[in-house]
């Protein structure tokens, strides 16, 4: 994905 910056900033470009 790479569009979930609401939960954690690490899931923004980790997925």
Swiss-Prot record:
This is Peroxidase 10. Keywords: Calcium, Heme, Hydrogen peroxide, Iron, Metal-binding, Oxidoreductase, Peroxidase. One of its GO terms (molecular function) is lactoperoxidase activity. It comes from Daucus carota (Wild carrot). Its cofactor is Ca(2+); heme b. Removal of H(2)O(2), oxidation of toxic reductants, biosynthesis and degradation of lignin, suberization, auxin catabolism, response to environmental stresses such as wounding, pathogen attack and oxidative stress. These functions might be dependent on each isozyme/isoform in each plant tissue. The lineage of its organism: Eukaryota, Viridiplantae, Streptophyta, Embryophyta, Tracheophyta. Its EC number is 1.11.1.7. It comes from the Eukaryota. It is an enzyme of class 1 (oxidoreductase). It catalyses: 2 a phenolic donor + H2O2 = 2 a phenolic radical donor + 2 H2O. Belongs to the peroxidase family. Classical plant (class III) peroxidase subfamily. Binds 2 calcium ions per subunit. GO terms for biological process: hydrogen peroxide catabolic process. The keyword Iron applies.
